[in-house]
Amino acid sequence: MPADYSSTARALALPISPLESPPSSPIQHAERPPWSRRISSGVRRAYNSASPYSSQPTTSFKDQILRKADKLQRKCITAWQNLSTLQKCLAIVAAILNIVLVALFLVYQHQIFASLAPFAERWRDLPGGWMILWAMTFVAAFPPLIGYSSTITIAGFVYGVPKGWAIVATSTVAGSTCSFLASRTILSTYVHRLVGKDKRFEALALTLKHDGIKILCMIRLCPLPYSLSNAAVATFPTVHPLNYALATALVTPKLFIHVFIGSRLGSLAGNEGMDTSTKMINYASIVIGGGLGATVGYIIYQRTMARAKELEIEELEAANGDVAPGRRVAAEYSDANNDDAALMNDDDISLWDNTDEPARYTDFVDEDEANVFASGDLDEEADIGGRGKMTRT
């Protein structure tokens, strides 16, 4: 029994596990702290999916149309519910009035065009009559006036495609430039109050800082209110008046659509003996031209706003120290400074032995030291056993 107890005591004195050598360089082998980890691929995918030019698979065109139609329906329902009773009554009256006017136009279209034909001829034969149309188009460029599209259609109705387009094109460039300068100077207070909080123009302001003349041309092609767009662009300090005039001149070919529609209306008004097939061709050309202009304008508007959103994401990433989406991640946020890591290592509590520090408590037995189990319980047991024998005797 004493021998077994002694061997058991020695076994308990042995280390529980073998001594593991500490890492040679805690800085090199330690795990990266959580604040220095790179951005995960999921986050990059989220940024890339937000970009309209990313390579992520998109939904079909049919699904996009259905989704946009559903969104438009919900917006209309919400807008209708927010109207007061008086506003709802006025909206119903306006809808009924529009239906009546369309019906009257379809029934009495020949009489309407016949009455307009002499008016167009007198205007065309009037000396300097084109200056009236030029002045009307020029004035329509200043906010908050309306009627710009009507003046272009009248130009085609009265003067036809070549001459009518030349009149409105030159007037558009001159009017837009003057409206731009006026909105930046004498009308600046009114313009900021009018369009300063418009989210559409706030988004376009960011794109102008990156894309310059290209985005200016896209803005001029967008189906935005003509006079309001002139005023809004004037609030962007990065736009130069000459660049704005150049962009307006570059997109004047779009006016051919409106002028062409006006010329077709003039043909319907001036030719009383036109057969049905010719009338149908003119009507079809009007519908196709209008639809083409609306579609192109809508597509350009969507792409312009998408570009604005992409640049907004890039600005946010640049502010946070990240890189733009869709580009190769060259360097991301990381605490790679060895000095900082060394300072952090000094503050940590190390469980490894350090030769530079005084000796600390250890569970390992030094061979030079006396075994604590060599004396103590064994001697006491021997003493107790001896006393027992003496007592028995």
Curated annotation (Swiss-Prot):
Instruction: Tell me which parts of the chain lie in the Lumenal compartment.
Output: 1-88, 147-164, 263-279
Q: Region VTT domain: which residues?
A: 156-265
Alphabetized UniProt keyword annotations: Glycoprotein, Golgi apparatus, Membrane, Transmembrane, Transmembrane helix
Compartments reported by the entry: Golgi apparatus membrane
Membrane topology classification: Multi-pass membrane protein
InterPro entries for this protein: Golgi_membrane_TVP38/TMEM64, VTT_dom
Please give the start and end residues of each transmembrane region. 89-109, 126-146, 165-187, 242-262, 280-300
Per its UniProt entry, which superkingdom is the organism in? Eukaryota
Name the major location: Golgi
Residue ranges of the region described as Disordered: 374-393
- What Gene Ontology cellular component terms go with this record? Golgi membrane
Query: Per the record, what ranges lie on the membrane's Cytoplasmic side?
Result: 110-125, 188-241, 301-393
Q: Tell me the protein family, please.
A: Belongs to the TVP38/TMEM64 family.
Role noted for this protein: Golgi membrane protein involved in vesicular trafficking and spindle migration.
What is recorded about the protein's domains? Answer: The VTT domain was previously called the SNARE-assoc domain. As there is no evidence that this domain associates with SNARE proteins, it was renamed as VMP1, TMEM41, and TVP38 (VTT) domain.
Q: Please report the name of this protein according to its UniProt entry.
A: Golgi apparatus membrane protein tvp38
Protein species of origin: Sclerotinia sclerotiorum (strain ATCC 18683 / 1980 / Ss-1)
